[in-house]
Amino acid sequence: MFSCDVLQPPIAKNCVLLKTLQRVQSNRITRVIRISFKEHPDYNLDFFEKKSYALKVKKILLIWMLMCLCFSCKTPPNVTVTKINYADFYGLVQSHSASSTQLQNSDTTEEQSADEPAEIGYVSVQLDAEIFEPKNEKYYDAILPNNMFSFLAYKNHCEIFFDASDITSFIFYINETKVDSSEICANGFSKIDASAIVKNGRNILYVSNIEKSSQSAALKIRIPYPILTRTNKKIPDVNYKALQLVDELLQSQVANGFPSVQLLVAKDGFIVADHSYGKIYNVDKFSDSGLSDAANVTGKTLYDLASNTKMYATVFAIQRLVFEKKISIHDKISKFFPEFSDEKKARRTGKSEMTIEHLLTHSSGFPAGAAYYAKKIVKNANGKDRKEKVLKEILKTKLINNVGSKVVYSDINFMLLSFIVEKVTGQTFDSFVEDKIYTPLSLKRICFKPLEHGFPLSEIAATEIGLNRSKRNETNNYFVHGHVHDPEAYNSMNEVSGHAGLFGNAESLAVLAQTMINGGGYGNTRIFSETITRNFLGVSQYHPAYALGWRMQNTDAYKWNFSTLASPQTFGHTGWTGTMSLFDVENNLIIIILTNAKHSAYTGGNQFEGDYFLTRNYGAITSIIYSAFSDYDSEYLATLLTELASQKFALINASPRFQNNGAYNDLAAIMQVLQKHSHSSTVKKFLKSEAAMQINNLLRKNSK
């Protein structure tokens, strides 16, 4: 019926509606409203006397006026400029290196740790830009890309450093927001807090119209990598009811017999959950009784990471060596070990063509394992000689598939990769990852052989119960505690291997995961480049669920672990002892779940009671965590909870494998959480159902 246009020409002055809304002042522009009735045959002022139309027009004009007022009153961006000195800009390691701040606390100005700075070779930032002029050979003839830069940032913490010495003025934008540069120019060396104007994820910085007071002047900009931030404040857009439900489930599972859990969740650079449950062990070595004086698990407790070693030691080491240009993923294994070749009359061949990429993607043709520790030649050897014997045995191992023809998950691949690292660097594998990865990132609670690093048993979670083994006067006769559980790593590789042996806490893995999201760096420390990160996180040509070493979601291939809600760009791994890590690059999300699920009663095969709890099977917990970052209501969460109970009951009825105390106790834990949510109409209805009655009967029967 009508259209509202913003224009300057005068219109009827006696229009009743327009007398009160004739002019709106916004950003020094006088705007006048003209109402044109395009479809009405009589274009005159009498039309406004029709009350119903007048009211509609008045409402629209009022809404328009309020919108204009909102835009005109927009608060300028809150950008704090701080004067710094030459050393602060060119030696950022003094105050902003990851080496001096592993985790930032956004509620205070204090750093959490103040360790020694990293070696100078590691000091690097994600953006180190100098604005060139056309006469410079580095200037792009496309023009605009010279002054536009992409960087990763989060709303909680983003600092940008400037060397504007002898710069009198310049135009400066972050995304669509223009920032006043006058104070930056006045200071010479400055840093700005851009937390209020950056967005979570990729941002664009644009500078232009640089005015200099000397010909030699050049505007320089540096931006550190994002770091993880702790806060006591609630983060917007986080459904804390979902995180509370996870907390209730984990507490209930531990109360019903699950050994222990360490959980860390980080979203957009904020740590939104960091909890620990249970004790480091729950049986006495001599009496089989529970121990009330066993140390509680804390955020500092170390867990046997099992196959997460492959990611956070071996893959990191290979990525670092590729960054240093000491190796290529296309290097053949025979380059490092010339004796590595097909044996005569081999049924499966290709050793001479096998590359590092084949090892990373489990397409080498090696079997899953070979129990080298059981071979007499290995058992009779000691120390360094034992590892040399193992290497010879690996190089002689027969292939079960032609190289590159099939993917078979194999520990041998990563054992061999650790030998390659040692061959190339001249260091032991554990010392290399400590020197080149963990120390530069100030990670003090991740290592091989934790007892030798001075960690007491009270800070390490125990693993398998009832494993009878002893070596070098070590006491592991009742349960494994402080030593790697994996028999190959323990007996063949002196507890240091590329496939198992690493111990760490959730916080350390979260920092390493954030390093991957960041593109290879953390704070002011670069471990490898963004190009290498992208290459290693690309889909393997051999299997859609593999990148280079990393497991990936891709086409929901890993949803049992990561959850269906995870983006295709989600990566991570699991460990046999009960550990899981994931980082979702698209959603800037990190989830670390560390458990000692094997520290429970044996049920047969490779299974223990702890393996039958939801916590150990990951996907249910990760699904609820993902829902914390979507706008799901309470009844949705209640529905998830009832689904967990009904389908766990169905699994128990469907398979004898699930008819054990682990599964029963898990179901009991779920039902106890349901009782806490009995105020929900969905839960209330379920608790009155026939299914709930059958579940309670089953639990009563098996509690006797």
Provide a role label for each language-model segment.
Residues V6, I29-L45, K51:
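N-terminal amphipathic/hydrophobic targeting modules at extreme N-termini
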Residues F71-S72:
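C-terminal motif of bacterial Sec signal peptides marking the signal peptidase cleavage site
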Residues N78-I174, A196-Y240, Q244, L249:
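Beta-strand-rich recognition domains
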Residues F172-D180, D268-G269:
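Short strand-turn-strand beta-turns centered on an Asx-Gly dipeptide
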Residues K234-N239, D288, N518, T531-N535, ...:
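Short, gly/Ser/Thr-rich active-site loops of penicillin-recognizing serine hydrolases
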Residues P236-Y303, K326, E343, Y602-Q607, ...:
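Short, conserved catalytic-motif segment at the N-terminal edge
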Residues Q244-L250, L263, G269, T301-H330, ...:
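Active-site SXXK
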Residues F270, Y281, K344-Q569:
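Short, surface-exposed loop or secondary-structure junction motifs
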